[in-house]
Regions:
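Catalytic alpha/beta core domains of metabolic enzymes, predominantly
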Residues: 2-3, 9-145
Length: 150
């Protein structure tokens, strides 16, 4: 069954990150099947598998919003934390990782950091509970940015 391919991305400290590739209905079904298989709901974290800036983040953003709206309207099967791997997604973009884009694109390191910051900021604004980043400098930058807002 195709569910198995999406079932388990990581299992750390007895928490399960379930990935359902930008499909809210499949996410809900996966949560139900996981609970039926014996995983406790409080041990589940959902990864909607969103893209980065320029590569489908708008669709991922809307899926996250719909999950949160369903959770707020009492959908118990979507009432689980949402995690995004924004660092990983950011570095899939050719604009973030390519060293051959020319001077107009700027230095590779600066560009990749900007891609990760923009992607993570958008996903935090969408309402994710956990954002996994790649660079400690980005964590510090985002903390400074959000201190003025929160």
């Amino acid at each position: 069954m195709y569910i198995i391919a999406f079932f388990l991305r990581i299992n750390i400290f007895d928490l399960f990150t379930l990935c359902a590739c930008l499909d809210i209905n499949l996410t809900k079904e996966l949560n139900i099947l996981s609970i039926d298989a014996g995983i406790k709901k409080e041990d589940i974290i959902v990864d909607p598998d969103t893209g980065c800036i320029g590569y489908g983040i708008d669709y991922g953003y809307s899926i996250i919003e719909r999950m949160i709206e369903a959770k707020n309207n009492g959908d118990d099967m979507l009432d689980v934390p949402i995690i995004v791997f924004s660092g990983l997604e950011s570095y899939k973009a050719k604009e973030a990782k390519s060293k051959n884009l020319g001077e107009i694109w700027g230095e590779s390191k600066t560009r990749s950091y900007a891609w990760e910051i923009a992607t993570t900021t958008a996903l935090i604004c969408a309402g994710v509970d956990i954002a996994v980043l790649w660079h400690p400098e980005i964590v510090d930058e985002l903390k400074r940015s959000f201190q003025g807002i929160c």
